[in-house]
Amino acid sequence: MKILKSLVLLVLFIVMPAKAHDTFSWMSTSFSGLKGLFGCLEVPEFTSFQESNIGINLSKAGTWQSTGHTVEKGKLLKINWSIAGVTTEPRKYLVLYRIDPRFSTPQVFIKTYNYSKLQFEALGFPRFVTNSNSSIPGAIPPDKELDALSFTKMSDSIKYYARNNVKIEVKAGDVVNISLVSKDNFFTSNTLDNILTEELDSSIFAASALYTQSNLGNFDNRIIYASAKEVCDIIDPSRDPNKPSGCSGTGATTKYKSINSNEALVGKPMMIGAVHNFMGLINSCPEHSGINTRPACYYDQGRGMIIKVGGQVIKGRDQSFVKSGRNSFIYYQATRNGIMDFTSDWQVNNMFSNSVLMSDWIRRFLNYPSFIDYINKNDWSANFLYFGRYSMIVEIGNGANSISSDVQQNINLEYLITYDGTLPDPSIRGTPVDYNFSADAPKDGYLWLRVVNPNSNIQGVVSVNYANYTGTTWFSDIVYNGAIKPITDQFRTFSKNFYIKLIKNSAVQNIAKGSLTLYVIIFGLMFVAGTLKLTAIEVITRICKIAIVAFLIREESWSFFNTYFFSVFTDGIDFFITNVVGATSSRSNIFGFIDPIFDKYTNGRIWGLLFIELLQIHNGLAFIAIITIYSLITYFRAILEVIIGYIIAFIGVTVMISLAPFFIILMLFEKTKSLFDNWISTLLSYVVQPTILLIFFLLIDQVLSEQLLKVVVRACWDTLIPIKIGLDLTNLSIPINFSFTLPFLPGIPFYVPDVPEINRSNIFNNNTNTFLVLFTTALLFYVYCLMSYGLVTFVNIVVGMLTNVTPARISGNYQARSDPVGAVMQDIGSVTTPIKNASMVPARIFKDKIIDQNYKAKKLEGGVEFTNKFFAKRNDVTKKEEGVRE
């Protein structure tokens, strides 16, 4: 000892005297680099499903659209899509409104816009036929020169304007916009079969031909309605006979006669030069001007034309279009269904002293010579002039943004899975998808979507939501494919074989035949005795009973009853479970819903954070982690109960079906019918029980998922156990006593839960993961897990109340119902008890050596030392304490 003291003193004299507050460069080193390297472990989000959405514009119909997601073979793929964003394109029409003296009402030429061909179509126009012999596709225009004087053509024209021309249909709620346009908008090359691409006109007289050219020359979108007197007062007020103006007479007897009478008959009131001269001398009529305004003027902005929808006037004759800059339009929202009609109450009749109407010509004349003689001999001086035209575009949209059911059926969605991300060719056909599609992916690869076969008159975006399962499926594969499915398949086969053997058994057949005979005899005797009041329902019921029992003993009995009756129960369990479950890993695996659950609760990050909390013994987080882990184990046991409940229910159904021949025979008689009814109720209870159990289980699982994320907190790399180096030399009579921490190693580094201390600001804030919030959340999590563990007993009671099928009582205990699932779980617990006890040994060692720190037991007087055996009695416990414990 003296030598040691001397060495220490020598060192102290050699080095500089050290003080408690002195520091050295090596002490300033820190492990912040490690902290930055490991960072923090965040609480994971449960993302077993990869979800996203895409909007497919109908303008890209037929083209595959990438989702950017990959799918795995055999895993769930869900696609939901909606056409809520799809609306009808505005219906577009080009309308040419023209006054022709040969027709009592205005001529209306209508073109319809075809969105699929991106052009207007002049449909139903008379005397246009496709020229199949021509090298240039198109149509032959109406023949105005050859065979022009044709009563047949006149008849066709009359019918066309009367009822055969294209109609513009308007529905209530439609928004109608009508705008005036130039003739160049109407006569365009983008017209089906090149019909009405140019003005229809002829330089010769053709009484039966149709014309579109303006009869006011270059002055378009104008109407003239003026008496001969007003016209002549403008162009020849003096009535000079030396001027070939065409005017004659004065006052009300004034007449106007075109130099070329033949052209006047087909809608040309004046020679082109005279028309231009006249139009240059007059002005636009004042607002709200009526007929025969003085002096003569022209009507524009839609005046002189009446527009109706379903008989309701939407623009009066004297009403002008709204003018905005260079545009003139009228806007209207329809209040009723109907046909849009362009007309006027200004009459063409009596423009000439003799009729120029086509309808009169074909009725009055039998041949062309008499018609020509009529034309040449009569005076065709006009009493008034009524000519002009309007060119318009009509756009009709639906204010409700709705599309018809027929249009909806033409919108389809397809999906395609490819091995690489290369854009598939549009010619490749995909798999059709309904509005709520759910199936297993047929192969691995990239997911593509597209819209096909949309109508040409719709626009908008098809909204598609899609999701695919990305978690593991090992548990359901083991449980269902490895255990449950072999059992259910075996019991299906057993049920079928047992049933067939029963109906082929001679004793069973004799019982069935005897029961039928006895039933008919009793029925006949009761009928003869008059004790039976027969109704139509009673007769039908008895006949059905006899037919069912008679069919029961036939060879095709199993095929018939299994198809139309037994399958309701055997497939009903799977059907209800499949439709109740929302999230599942596979549609073909009815227990696929367990995979997302196990994927959540076996997440490595979750258990890693729980392990980190287990290390926090000093602040109580270890207790919270223990509660959470025990709760999860309890919940896993509840999952096992659900699986066992399904197996027992299915076995019960198959056993009841195998005994069906006995119970079906019992339905004949009233005394035994109750057994048949109980049999049906039992079958129904077996179907309902796993369904209700699963519903409750999934509801609790939703709550558990939220609570688990609150129990587990993020952990960051920090000091787990602080390390302090102390130096105390007072025992050596040296006045030195201090301690310090090494900056580069202040303690044992590891992840530490990020839990704030409780203070006034967060004590009542549930969003802050304080110790109080964690503790209460852990207790709630434990309570919910206990609820899931007791679901089987609760569901048995509920099903018993619904179906009147009460579980059997435990022998010697009338109050307690027997629970097959509980019995199975108890047997499993008995088998696993040794394993559980063995697993508790390390925990006992940890408690005894670390927490209680009982390294060596005290020796009793006259006793022996501690045996060091785990299950031996403690020697450090007095007999008095043992008595208290006992």
Swiss-Prot record:
Identify the stretch annotated as signal peptide in this record.
1-20
Predominant location: membrane
Write out the similarity annotation: Belongs to the TrbL/VirB6 family.
Membrane spanning segments where? Answer: 520-540, 563-583, 609-629, 647-667, 680-700, 771-791
User: What Pfam families does this protein's entry cite?
Assistant: TrbL
Q: How does it sit in the membrane?
A: Multi-pass membrane protein
The record's section on InterPro entries has: Conjugal_tfr_TrbL/VirB6
Biological process according to GO: protein secretion by the type IV secretion system
Q: Which UniProt keywords apply?
A: Cell membrane, Membrane, Signal, Transmembrane, Transmembrane helix
**Entry's Gene Ontology cellular component terms:** plasma membrane
- Top-rank taxon of the source lineage equals Bacteria
Q: What is this protein called?
A: Uncharacterized protein RT0029
The listed locations are: Cell membrane
